[in-house]
């Protein structure tokens, strides 16, 4: 993916997210300090489970780890830190589950594959990763960095991600 293509995709994604935020009206726009289950967090970018949380999620789903990864997750890399990690794909990325997410797909629109749009909730709520449990749209907090750091030095191919 070229530089300008990346800028265009990012710009289009930001516009989409801005429109979605207006429609969904998350707690931050309502002046509330509790989750209103609008799904905006689950649409912007899925949460990042730690390697241990990923194993718990697979068990909750009644699957072997690699089986769950190949059905629901993708791999990515945090640019400046060279940390590879695994996280839930979006519904629009179902064609690349179990694979390393192509750069041009970073800004795909849509909800997390584990989010139930009709029921407006997480299908793995009881084992939802800490990065999602701690996320509060009404606060400016970084819940992803701690989860990302747990992936440092881990080969995500061991979790079933194909390159």
Language-model regions, residue ranges each:
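Short loop/turn segments that flank or connect secondary-structure elements
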Residues: 1-163
């Amino acid at each position: 993916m070229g530089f300008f293509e990346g800028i265009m995709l990012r710009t289009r994604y930001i516009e989409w997210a801005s429109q979605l935020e207006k429609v969904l009206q998350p707690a931050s726009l309502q002046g509330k300090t509790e989750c209103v289950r609008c799904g905006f967090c689950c649409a912007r970018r899925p949460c990042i489970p730690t390697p241990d949380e990923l194993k718990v999620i697979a068990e909750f789903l009644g699957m072997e780890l690699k089986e769950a990864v190949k059905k629901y997750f993708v791999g990515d890399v945090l640019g400046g830190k060279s940390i590879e990690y695994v996280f839930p794909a979006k519904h629009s990325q179902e064609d690349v589950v179990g694979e390393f997410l192509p750069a041009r797909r970073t800004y795909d629109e849509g909800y997390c594959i584990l989010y139930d749009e009709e029921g407006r909730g997480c299908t793995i709520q009881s084992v939802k990763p800490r990065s999602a449990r701690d996320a509060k749209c009404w606060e400016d907090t970084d819940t992803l960095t701690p989860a990302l750091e747990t992936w440092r030095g881990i080969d995500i191919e061991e979790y079933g991600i194909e390159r």
